Amino acid sequence: MIVLTLCLFLFLYSSVSCTSNNDCVQVNVTQLPGNENIIKDFLFQNFKEEGSLVVGGYYPTEVWYNCSTTQQTTAYKYFSNIHAFYFDMEAMENSTGNARGKPLLVHVHGNPVSIIVYISAYRDDVQFRPLLKHGLLCITKNDTVDYNSFTINQWRDICLGDDRKIPFSVVPTDNGTKLFGLEWNDDYVTAYISDESHRLNINNNWFNNVTLLYSRTSTATWQHSAAYVYQGVSNFTYYKLNKTAGLKSYELCEDYEYCTGYATNVFAPTSGGYIPDGFSFNNWFMLTNSSTFVSGRFVTNQPLLVNCLWPVPSFGVAAQEFCFEGAQFSQCNGVSLNNTVDVIRFNLNFTTDVQSGMGATVFSLNTTGGVILEISCYNDTVSESSFYSYGEIPFGVTDGPRYCYVLYNGTALKYLGTLPPSVKEIAISKWGHFYINGYNFFSTFPIDCIAFNLTTGASGAFWTIAYTSYTEALVQVENTAIKKVTYCNSHINNIKCSQLTANLQNGFYPVASSEVGLVNKSVVLLPSFYSHTSVNITIDLGMKRSVTVTIASPLSNITLPMQDNNIDVYCIRSNQFSVYVHSTCKSSLWDNNFNSACTDVLDATAVIKTGTCPFSFDKLNNYLTFNKFCLSLNPVGANCKLDVAARTRTNEQVFGSLYVIYEEGDNIVGVPSDNSGLHDLSVLHLDSCTDYNIYGRTGVGIIRKTNSTLLSGLYYTSLSGDLLGFKNVSDGVVYSVTPCDVSAQAAVIDGAIVGAMTSINSELLGLTHWTTTPNFYYYSIYNYTNVMNRGTAIDNDIDCEPIITYSNIGVCKNGALVFINVTHSDGDVQPISTGNVTIPTNFTISVQVEYIQVYTTPVSIDCARYVCNGNPRCNKLLTQYVSACQTIEQALAMGARLENMEIDSMLFVSENALKLASVEAFNSTENLDPIYKEWPNIGGSWLGGLKDILPSHNSKRKYRSAIEDLLFDKVVTSGLGTVDEDYKRSAGGYDIADLVCARYYNGIMVLPGVANDDKMTMYTASLTGGITLGALSGGAVAIPFAVAVQARLNYVALQTDVLNKNQQILANAFNQAIGNITQAFGKVNDAIHQTSKGLATVAKALAKVQDVVNTQGQALSHLTVQLQNNFQAISSSISDIYNRLDELSADAQVDRLITGRLTALNAFVSQTLTRQAEVRASRQLAKDKVNECVRSQSQRFGFCGNGTHLFSLANAAPNGMIFFHTVLLPTAYETVTAWSGICASDGSRTFGLVVEDVQLTLFRNLDEKFYLTPRTMYQPRVATSSDFVQIEGCDVLFVNGTVIELPSIIPDYIDINQTVQDILENFRPNWTVPELPLDIFHATYLNLTGEINDLEFRSEKLHNTTVELAILIDNINNTLVNLEWLNRIETYVKWPWYVWLLIGLVVIFCIPILLFCCCSTGCCGCIGCLGSCCHSICSRGQFESYEPIEKVHVH
C-alpha cells in the first residue's frame, strides 16, 4: 500500500509535496560523479555564441532522491506542485559497475494529454535478457495507466502517434554524465534527453503532478542504492552564463530584480543576427508610419535582424554618438554582423513604471548636408526665447505632459506634439524617421549619426542598443507590443508566415511565393523608326522662414519648354519621349525678394507627386505608352493633374499643379534615354526570372522560346488576363511567359516539410527525391532514387502509417507517398423483403436511373498567389488583412479532409466486383470458372465459341465450284419433289438418255423443263427426220420428239398445280400471321413507349451527372474570370499598377484589387462549403440506398425508384454513384373499402377481431362478403378464423394534441415541414452568393450536352415512332391477302388396252383356282374324301400299329 503524506518543504519560493516511505532517501548532489558538468552542459545547450546571458527556468537545483524497495513488487512515489522533473542514471559511490537495472516509469499528469517516460529493465544475467538500448517518451490521452501491467510493448497502444513518440538511448556506462528531464508550461513541453532538447508544442492544462514507478534494490553495494535518482522542481531560478574565447562559466544569479530584468531584456543574437526563441521582447514595438496595430499576427518588414546588441548598464553625462555607417561593434553581446544598419533601437529595459531619465536629454540628428536637428520636449508652453532653456525627454512614466519640438540652432522649426505618457523604446532609421514606442513621431532627410546625453536616473535600469536591419518576419502583437517573432528565412518559416502561425499543424499548405528581388528588365516593342523628344521641366522654388516652419512661396515657378510660341502647353509629337525635372531654390527672409541661396533648414527640392493621374510622374520614362500625351499649366481640357511640392527637412508642401492631357494607346512610349532611329528596341532575357514589359503588358516571369507557330496576334492572354505568350513580329518566333515560381502544396509533419506536390518536374523546397502520380509530381525527403519507384506512380511496397491525407493518398512521417488503406469486403449480401404498396391488379416492369453525388473534388487555393500573383509589395499589403487568406485556405483544407475521412469510412472494395468491372476480364476463363472453364468463351482470349454457329463443311459436295460457275450458265427453276434429282442420277450426264430416264409424278410422265443445246439439237433432228421420211413411212422417227414435248408440258402443268396449292397455303398462313403481327406491333409500341420514358430518365440522370461534375469547374472558372475585374482600380494587373504609379498611390489601387479578390474568394469558399454540406447529406442518402436498394429489397414505395422495388444495381459515376432500379409499375388497380377490424357482440359482451397479418387487407365486397387480399397484389380469398386476433373491445381512443405535443406522445415523430423549415433557417446565408455563370475553364470539364441532347432527341424520336406504329397497325389490320385462285384442271388418264387384257386374264385364271381351293380341299372336301378311301384300301396290310416312343434324357 502507498501512503501519501507531506514529506518535504523546499522554502525558496514554493514547496514540493511527495510520498513518504522508507524506500526514498535524499542524496547529496556532490555524490553524483560528473555532476559538475551536468548543469553546465545543460545550461549551455542553447547558448552557442560568445557573450553574457542570464537564463531562467525550472532547473535541477533542488533535492535529489534515491528510491528503492526491498520488496519484490514495484513501488510508487508521487510528486506534486512541481513544474519540471529530472532523473539520472545509477552513479552511486562504490557501485559494483554493471548493476542490474530496473524499469522506470514517469507519468506527468495533465488534460487533455499526459506524458509518459518509460525505460525497460536491463540485465545480462543467466536469463539472457539483453542490455537496455532504448527508452521512450510519448504523449498519451489516457488519464490512468495500469503501471503494474505496463510493458515496453504497450506504449504502441497508448501513445497518440509517431509524431508524439521520442525514442532515446540509455546506456549504463553513461552514469552521471547525462541529464534527463521534462519542463512544461501551458504552451509547450521541453524534453532534455540524451544531450538533446526537444520542444513539443502542446497546448495543455498541466496538473503539476508526477507519478514515479520504481523497483526493488539493485545489486550495488551501497545501501538503498538504485538504478536512478530523481528530482522534482518547483522553484524558478536564474543562472548567469558567460562564454568568452570558448571558455564557459556560470553562476547562480541571486539578485532577483537584476536577474529578472537581465533575463527579460538581454539576449545573445544567434548566427545570422536572429533573435533567439523564448525572448520576451519586453518594450519592443512594431514600427509603423501609419496607424498602430493593437493585436494580431502580421507578416511585415521590420528591423528585427540584429547586427549587434549592446547591453548598457548606464550612461554618463557626456554625449554618446551612434552612426549608421562604419559603426564599430566592440561591445556586442553574441554575434556581430557587418550588415548595413537600417535602424538603431534604444530599448529602455525597466520593469516598473518609474521615471528613468532625469538629466537634460536632447536627441541630435545629423542629417544629410551636415544640418543638425535637435529634438527636445518641455513641460510647458514656451516662447521662442525659452527654447534655449533646459529641455528633456524623460524615459519611463512622465509626471505630466511634455511638448516636443524640432530645433535648429536653438530655434524651433516644427512642433511635433505631446510626448507619450510612457516612453519605452526609441527607434531612429537612417532614412530620417524618428519612432517613439513604434509610432513615427517625426520624419526628415536621411540621417548619418545620432547623439544624445542621458543619465539613467534613480531606477537603476539599464539599456540595450540594437543595431538592426530590416527583414521579413511574422510578428505577433499584443497590446501594441511585440510578443513573438518568426523569421521568414526558410522554407518552413515561409509557410508559417503565409499561414500567420508559428506552430503548423500536420497538413498540406500552399508554398509561399519567393521574393523575386532585383531582376533584369525585358522589353518587347514593335520595330519602328523612332524620333525622340526630351522634355525638360524647370521648377524654381522660393522658400521663406516662418516663425516655426519653413514654407514654399506660391510665387514658385513651373516652366515648360516652348512649343509653337506657347509655354503653357507642350505636346509630344514624336513616338518616343523622356521627361526630366530641374529644380532651383532661392530663399528670402520676410519679403518676396528671392535672391539668397537655400541653405541649412531652408534647403528644399522639388518633387512631382501622383495627384489624380493613374500613373506617377517618375514612372513616365518606364516604357509607359500613350496615343497622345501633353503637359499643361492650365486645367482646361486636362484629364488629370500632378501635384508639385517642395520637400524640406521638416515637411512637404504642395504649391502648384502640372496638368496632363493624354489618351491611352501604343503610339508614344516613354523611355529612359534617347533611342531615335530605326530600331527594334526589344530586349529579352530568356530562361530566367525577368521584369517584363511586352507590348505594354507588364509583369514578372520567365520567358522561353517555343516551337509553336501562330499566324495571328501579337500577344496571348488567359481568361484572367495573365500573359501566356507573345510573338516577335520580326521573325515570327512565339515565346511563352510563365511565372517565376509555381504554386505547390507542401506536406508538413511535426513542424518540418517532408514532401511537396507540384505541377512541374523541378526541385523545390530543398527536396531532391521525386516520383510521379497521374495528377502531379511529388518531391520528398523519402529516397525515391530506386529505379523501381522513381518516375513511377506510388510505390505500393512502402509500409508506413500516413499522418496526413489528401484525397485517396497519404503522406507518412518519412515523406513517403502511399495509398490510403481501404476497407475490403468478401462479398455482398442481398436479402429480399416484401414491399409496402397499394393493391394493383397488373404491373409493368420498368428500369429507372438515378444519380447521387457522393463526393466533390478537393480544391486547394493558394490565396496569396490568387490575390497578388507573386507581387512582393502586394503580399505585404495582404498581411494587413490578418488571417483572411489563412481562413480561406484552412476552410477548404478542413472541408476536404473531413470529406476524405467520411468517404474512406463509407467505401468498401470487393475484389470480385472489381474484377468483373473490367470488360476484358468479364468473360475470361478464370472469372467464368468453374461453370464455363472448359468451354471457349466469347469476349475472352479467343472466339472459339462462335464455331457452333458457323456453317459446317460437308464431305459430299452439293455445289459447283467457283470455276464451274464461271464456265457454265447456271439456270435455277422450280422442281417437283425429287423428280429433278432422280432424273439427273438416271441420265448420268448423257443427253441421249433423256427420254429413257423420264420420271413419273402422280402417274404422269414428266421431264425437267430445261433442255440444253445438245437435247434441242437431238430432238430437232428427230422432228426433221420424221417430217422428211413421213411419206416413206418414216414418221416414227419423230416419236421421241413428241413424247419429250408432252412430258415437259406435263411437267409445267403439274408445276402450276403445286404453285396453286402453295399459294393457297401461303395466303392462309399470311392472313393468320397478320393477326399475330398486329398484336406484336402493339407490344412493340408499348415497349418503345417505355423505352422512350427510360431514355428520358437516363437523360435526366446524365444531366445531373454533368451538372455535378461541372459545378466546381464553373465556380473555378468564375473565380478565374474575376481576375479580369479591376474592382474600380485603374487596372486588373498589379504589376501594371506599380509600373504606372508611385508606391503609395499604387498601394491604394492594389488595396481595391485585394479587397475585391478576397471577396470573390470568400464567395467561392462559401459556395464550396455549402456544396460540401449538400454532398454530405447526399452521401448519406447514397449509403442508405446501397443498403436498402442494392443489398436488400426495399419495402418503401418510391425510395428505390418510383414503384414496387424488385432489385437495384449500382455503378460508379463521376463524383458519385448511379443506380439502376428495376421496379414494378402498377397499370391497373382494384379499389376496395378496407376494414381495420370487425366488431361483434353476442348479447352479453362486445369484442373485436382484427387481422393478424399486417400484410393483409380486410375488405367487404359487393356481394356483402368479407375477403382478405395481400396489399402487394389483388388476390382476394375468403377469410378464415386463423387470420384474426380477438381484442378486448371495439372502442377507439383518440388523443387530442397539438403538433408541439406530438413528440412527447410519439418520441420518433418528425414534422417534415417544420424540419425542412428549420434546416433552411439554420443554413440561410447572411451573404449573397454570386451568380456563377458557365464559362470555359482550364480544368476537368465534363461536357455531356451533346449526349444528353442526343438522348432527348432519341426519346422524342421513339415517341414519334410509337405514333407512327399505331397508324401502321391500323393499316396492317386493313391489309388482308385476297389472292385470285388459279384454275385447276383435273385430267384423268385412261389405262391402255393391254392393261385391261391383263386384268381379264388374271381374273379368269384366279377365280377357278380360288373356287377349287375352297370347295375341294380340307377334310370335308371332295379330294379329301377320295384320298381317305384310297388310303384305307391300299395300305392296311403293310403297316402294323406301334407304340409311341417317348424321349429319354440321359444324364
Swiss-Prot record:
Subcellular location: Virion membrane; Host endoplasmic reticulum-Golgi intermediate compartment membrane
Positions occupied by motif KxHxx: 1447-1451
GO cellular component: host cell endoplasmic reticulum-Golgi intermediate compartment membrane; membrane; viral envelope; virion membrane
Region (Heptad repeat 1 (HR1)): 1039-1158
Stored Pfam families: CoV_S1, CoV_S1_C, CoV_S2, CoV_S2_C
Membrane topology label: Single-pass type I membrane protein
InterPro entries: ALPHA_CORONA_SPIKE (IPR042552), CoV_S1_C (IPR043607), S2_sf_CoV (IPR043473), Spike_S1_CoV (IPR002551), Spike_S2_CoV (IPR002552), Spike_S2_CoV_C (IPR043614), Spike_S2_CoV_HR1 (IPR044873), Spike_S2_CoV_HR2 (IPR044874)
Membrane topology (Intravirion): 1413-1451
Keyword match Coiled coil: yes
Description of its domains: The KxHxx motif seems to function as an ER retrieval signal.
Protein name: Spike glycoprotein
Function: S1 region attaches the virion to the cell membrane by interacting with host ANPEP/aminopeptidase N, initiating the infection. Binding to the receptor probably induces conformational changes in the S glycoprotein unmasking the fusion peptide of S2 region and activating membranes fusion. S2 region belongs to the class I viral fusion protein. Under the current model, the protein has at least 3 conformational states: pre-fusion native state, pre-hairpin intermediate state, and post-fusion hairpin state.
N-terminal signal peptide: 1-31
Sequence intervals crossing the membrane: 1393-1412
S1: annotated segments: 32-779
Subunit note: Homotrimer. During virus morphogenesis, found in a complex with M and HE proteins. Interacts with host ANPEP.
